[in-house]
């Protein structure tokens, strides 16, 4: 089935019914996708401040009301506890489980943060003629923990996570221009070229997602990634945090064109 041409609400319904459980890259072309962080209210201000201080890695699209599983703006009929293909639960910084629903874990003090995802600009890259390798290879995007320190806020501190896409040399400028127009979904790359400069020792062994082929004449290009909060959570070890599983996003009703240059 070609999910790229489906409406976001249709795909969310399939996810809620358990009919889609894999990565969402390439789905609902032209619509923004969002990373998810759910944490107790007592940690919400610190995380909001962390996101504000690290807008490249954590560009906020929406924050929920306390205890609410619904959103007001980016996906009004969404259920935050059921409309993502796969969730991760961290307790004291340790990954304790992955679930297709977190309804059974929901608490009245939870606050949800929806963070822009680079999957959003992939349809723009494809439209501009720039290849997206993990879509070609039908796998998840490779993601790496770097040596780039995030700006700390409250209890939150740690290293930035990046996503990597191999780009032909002659299309790097185009890819920077296309993605730079969309700062709400990470914007321009944080690094282009030699992976070791940002602390990546083996480009074939991502910390999250899948390895992809880098062809002759291509260079690895790295964008800030909304999996950064998961790296931070593993570092600071709060009692409980729920996130999306890397590559498994909330598909919003917000069109890419509406968040360009914003």
Swiss-Prot record:
One of its GO terms (molecular function) is lyase activity. The keyword Lyase applies. It comes from the Bacteria. Its EC number is 4.2.1.-. Keywords: Lyase. Transmembrane segments: none annotated. InterPro entries: D-Glu_cyclase, Putative_hydro-lyase, UPF0317. Disulfide bonds: none annotated. HAMAP family: Hydro_lyase. Belongs to the D-glutamate cyclase family. This is Putative hydro-lyase Cbei_2760. It comes from Clostridium beijerinckii (strain ATCC 51743 / NCIMB 8052) (Clostridium acetobutylicum).
């Amino acid at each position: 089935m070609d999910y790229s041409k489906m409406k976001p609400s249709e795909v969310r319904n399939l996810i809620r019914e358990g009919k889609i459980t894999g990565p969402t890259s390439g789905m609902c072309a032209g619509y923004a996708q969002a990373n998810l962080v759910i944490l107790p209210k007592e940690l919400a201000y610190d995380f909001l401040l962390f996101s504000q201080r690290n807008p490249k890695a954590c560009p906020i699209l929406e924050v929920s009301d306390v205890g609410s599983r619904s959103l007001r703006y980016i996906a009004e009929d969404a259920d935050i506890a059921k409309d993502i293909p796969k969730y991760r639960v961290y307790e004291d910084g340790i990954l304790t489980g992955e679930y297709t629903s977190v309804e059974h874990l929901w608490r009245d003090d939870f606050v949800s943060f929806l963070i822009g995802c680079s999957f959003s600009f992939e349809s723009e890259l494809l439209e501009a003629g720039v290849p997206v390798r993990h879509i070609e290879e039908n796998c998840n995007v490779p993601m790496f923990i770097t040596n780039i320190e995030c700006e700390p806020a409250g209890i939150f501190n740690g290293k930035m996570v990046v996503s990597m896409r191999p780009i032909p040399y002659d299309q790097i400028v185009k890819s920077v221009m296309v993605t730079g127009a969309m700062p709400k979904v990470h914007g321009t790359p944080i690094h282009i070229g030699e992976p070791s400069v940002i602390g990546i020792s083996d480009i074939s062994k991502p910390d999250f997602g899948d390895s992809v082929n880098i062809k002759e004449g291509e260079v690895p290009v790295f964008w800030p990634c909304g999996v950064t909060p998961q790296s931070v959570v593993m570092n600071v070890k709060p009692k409980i945090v729920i996130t999306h599983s890397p590559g498994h996003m909330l598909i919003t009703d917000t069109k890419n064109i509406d968040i360009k240059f914003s």
